[in-house]
């Protein structure tokens, strides 16, 4: 059956700021306390979405979350009106204010793990929300992510959206950023590659930075998504590269159809994994980048592998890269060699995503891949699909509500909270989502 990969990109939120909240993510840490530009960040993301849609790649948008998220501050013991809560936390514990104001939901590669209908036992598209429990600020996302996905994939005959796994370390799940699918045409059954960093009873794990994904979580997600057991491979990421800042597998590898583009040191027991994939995926091709040409450090700093590998109708592929790759002589030299070599990659497309990159999120972080048949695509909430009208409406919305300068101190401004809620209220109407945000259901959360 014919099917297409639709990229659902996260729209950057109004409180996008640099707080260094993500230990193990070196870009996040080294840009801590810099001044951010939320308006520019949102527009950079929108330009990528529109350019890819115009190039013929189906594209949709996932909206930001409510931030600052007052209900969690109340759970932490801050009381009074919303304004009083903001004032108290800013004065007594500003780190909590930064955490509950993070715009990290923009990186929707961590929103959920997807199983296309061609791979599932019941013939539905399955989406399991990620619990993201390794980082406090990201653990706050799951409930609203579930509401948003249910509003977008609202046809229960075709889509099953599963709640996140229990919030315990044993079941740490980071979503599609640790998941690849390999195979032929999108509508054919594919091989799902779940990548984990640690498992109970296995001493092979990183020592410097945390391994966020567990094998136990990956196995549970595969069960929830009803993936045919014959179409699943579990593989461990190389713990040494996690310790070098590869906090998700999509920082060191990306797949599309029959191609796996990865670093030579991406996986533990890599040669064994690639042999397994060759045996189980027709036409499988591994493009392994040697460490002698691109070091892990350079891969992390440029986000070479946090790229999008997209298929054209003629079978050729386009690699979507952040501008940092073009600015690094060694990486750009390798990429031009790659273009000249015998492989399906025939075009490089470069985007300026500096605002997201400075927090450790490249092109692949910003998108959630969902393979859909034509019938399934028609069943998706049409208001989220990118086109000229939506692009213009979202740009106008960003111009109206987003600031062009934001510091950690600005997060305590009650007007940022009020303006953000007004903006999301308008956006949820524009995207026909209904009442997906807690403030919409609870009358603003005062009291």
Swiss-Prot record:
Enzyme class: hydrolase
Residue numbers annotated as active site: 174, 248, 365 (nucleophile)
PANTHER family named in the record: N-SUCCINYLARGININE DIHYDROLASE (PTHR30420:SF2)
Pathway(s): Amino-acid degradation; L-arginine degradation via AST pathway; L-glutamate and succinate from L-arginine: step 2/5
Pfam family, one: AstB
Keyword Hydrolase: yes
Name of the protein: N-succinylarginine dihydrolase
NCBIfam families named among the record's database cross-references: arg_catab_astB (TIGR03241), PRK13281.1 (NF009789)
Signal peptide: none
Catalytic activity as recorded in UniProt: N(2)-succinyl-L-arginine + 2 H2O + 2 H(+) = N(2)-succinyl-L-ornithine + 2 NH4(+) + CO2
EC annotation from Swiss-Prot or TrEMBL: 3.5.3.23
Presence of keyword RNA-binding: no
Reported function: Catalyzes the hydrolysis of N(2)-succinylarginine into N(2)-succinylornithine, ammonia and CO(2).
Record-level GO BP terms: arginine catabolic process to glutamate; arginine catabolic process to succinate
Quaternary structure and partners: Homodimer.
Upper lineage: Bacteria, Pseudomonadati, Pseudomonadota, Gammaproteobacteria, Enterobacterales
Family: Belongs to the succinylarginine dihydrolase family.
Keywords per UniProt: Arginine metabolism, Hydrolase
GO MF assignments: N-succinylarginine dihydrolase activity
Binding site for substrate: 19-28, 110, 137-138, 212, 250, 359
InterPro entries: AstB_sf, SuccinylArg_d-Hdrlase_AstB
């Amino acid at each position: 059956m014919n099917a297409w990969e639709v990229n659902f990109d996260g729209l950057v939120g109004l409180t996008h700021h640099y707080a260094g909240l993500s230990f193990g993510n070196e870009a996040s840490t080294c840009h801590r306390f810099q001044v951010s530009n939320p308006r520019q960040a949102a527009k950079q993301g929108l330009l990528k979405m529109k350019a890819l849609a115009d190039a013929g790649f189906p594209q949709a948008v996932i909206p930001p979350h409510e931030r600052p998220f007052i209900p969690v501050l109340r759970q932490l013991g801050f009381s009074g009106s919303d304004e009083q809560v903001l004032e108290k936390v800013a004065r007594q514990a500003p780190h909590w204010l930064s955490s509950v104001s993070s715009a990290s939901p923009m990186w929707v590669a961590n929103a959920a793990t997807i199983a296309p209908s061609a791979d599932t036992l019941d013939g539905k598209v399955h989406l399991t929300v990620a619990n993201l429990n390794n980082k406090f600020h990201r653990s706050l996302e799951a409930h609203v992510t579930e509401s948003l996905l249910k509003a977008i994939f609202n046809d229960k005959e075709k889509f099953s959206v599963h709640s996140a796994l229990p919030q315990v370390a044993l079941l740490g799940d980071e979503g599609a950023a640790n998941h690849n699918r390999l195979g032929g045409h999108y509508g054919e059954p594919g091989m799902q590659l779940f990548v984990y960093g640690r498992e109970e009873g296995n001493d092979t794990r990183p020592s410097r930075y945390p391994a966020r994904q567990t094998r136990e979580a990956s196995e549970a997600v595969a069960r929830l998504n009803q993936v045919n057991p014959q179409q699943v491979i579990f593989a461990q990421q190389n713990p040494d590269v996690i310790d070098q800042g590869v906090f998700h597998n999509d920082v060191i590898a990306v797949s599309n159809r029959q191609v796996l583009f990865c670093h030579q040191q991406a996986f533990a027991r890599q040669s064994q994994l690639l042999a397994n994939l060759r045996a189980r995926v027709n036409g499988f091709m591994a493009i392994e980048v040697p460490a002698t040409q691109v070091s892990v450090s350079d891969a992390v700093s440029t986000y070479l592998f946090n790229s999008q590998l997209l298929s054209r109708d003629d079978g050729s592929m386009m690699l979507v890269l952040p501008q940092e790759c073009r600015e690094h002589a060694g990486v750009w030299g390798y990429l031009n060699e790659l273009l000249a070599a015998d492989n399906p990659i025939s075009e490089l497309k470069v985007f300026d995503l500096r605002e997201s990159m400075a927090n450790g999120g490249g092109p692949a972080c910003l998108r959630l891949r969902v393979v859909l048949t034509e019938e399934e695509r028609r069943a998706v909430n049409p208001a989220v699909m990118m086109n000229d009208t939506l692009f213009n409406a979202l740009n106008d919305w960003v111009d109206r509500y987003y600031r062009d300068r934001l510091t950690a101190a600005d997060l305590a401004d009650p007007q940022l909270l009020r303006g953000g809620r007004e903006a999301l209220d308008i956006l949820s109407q524009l995207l026909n989502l209904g009442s997906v945000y807690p403030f919409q259901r609870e009358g603003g959360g005062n009291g």
